[in-house]
Amino acid sequence: MAEEDVAALVVDNGSGMCKAGFAGDDAPRAVFPSIVGRPRHQGVMVGMGQKDSYVGDEAQSKRGILTLKYPIEHGIVTNWDDMEKIWHHTFYNELRVAPEEHPVLLTEAPLNPKANREKMTQIMFETFNSPAMYVAIQAVLSLYASGRTTGIVLDSGDGVTHTVPIYEGYALPHAILRLDLAGRDLTDYLMKILTERGYSFTTTAEREIVRDIKEKLCYVALDFEQEMNTASASSSLEKSYELPDGQVITIGNERFRCPEAMFHASFLGMESVGIHETTYNSIMKCDVDIRKDLYANTVLSGGTTMFPGIADRMQKEITALAPPTMKIKIIAPPERKYSVWIGGSILASLSTFQQMWISKQEYDESGPSIVHRKCF
């Protein structure tokens, strides 16, 4: 089989959403929730040809009769049976390809346990008969997508946030920090503070509404105290939002109180430091000679970095922590919600990358541990 003629598949499995498509494309073809649902009661839908499981949007729309599970928690796969269902759905239903005909590039969280990388490799070759595969670290792909090979990536999605310093294309594992504060926590926090205003959001269906409010109306304040004063003095920051049933709600200081939790985890009752300090701590764990390059190339990535105002606030906070004369640059590409996938698309279509694939033959000779020798 001539590899050149066949487009590689790129699959970015996030805690919240799975992004999938073809190498060389500029955006993923398929984006769907990383969920698997199973019927709560057998045989409720008699004659409906009821399936034993549903994946993605279909699971989401039938959630009333299903028990929903997220097989990826905090960026790490915890349920392999469900993960296999998500991959099956990706290949056969979303991309409509035969996985045995295409090389596949998968992404993994930073500090993904070795056993997990081996399991991913094994499933691709043994269950899906992939001709070739590769596993790449998510944050590294985001950095490539921004046209860099050195920098620090703040990657924040639905389930986890990481700060990943990268030098000449290699992540520096000793300096990677993980923060279990991400999009899902912000949605939960917004549900909580909207309840204090007298609106009740409790069910999973209502959580989706709150997530939409968060994505459409929230922003990061440059100066939190000052913004709070502005909000209490006038209604200039208030916005209205129409719920699916036609009811209109008003949201004021919640708009910036919600994402402020990223800088003050104590809002969520968490002990950890905010994203700015985590980024700084990550830089400080690196060799003193490369810090300058990291400060000047701080790249934001992932859906939870999409809040308006976040780059300016990061610039302000990191400047306050860094040495006085240090040049600090925060890069926030407009497409950063999908930059991991885009980086994968770029990498998998490079002519120089074609020798990097793990082939089925290499897997058959060496077994799953081949992944540690070829993907780093």
Curated annotation (Swiss-Prot):
Catalytic activity: ATP + H2O = ADP + phosphate + H(+)
UniProt enzyme class: hydrolase
Enzyme nomenclature, EC number: 3.6.4.-
Location of the protein in the cell: Cytoplasm, Cytoskeleton
InterPro entries xrefs: Actin, Actin/actin-like_CS, Actin_CS, ATPase_NBD
One GO cellular component term noted in the UniProt record for this chain: cytoskeleton
Major location (coarse): cytoplasm
One GO MF term attached to the UniProt entry: hydrolase activity
Highest taxon of source: Eukaryota
Keyword annotations of the record: ATP-binding, Cytoplasm, Cytoskeleton, Hydrolase, Nucleotide-binding
Sections of the chain in a coiled coil: none
PANTHER family hit by this protein: ACTIN (PTHR11937)
Function: Actins are highly conserved proteins that are involved in various types of cell motility and are ubiquitously expressed in all eukaryotic cells.
UniProt record similarity statement: Belongs to the actin family.
Protein name according to UniProt: Actin-2
Gene: ACT2
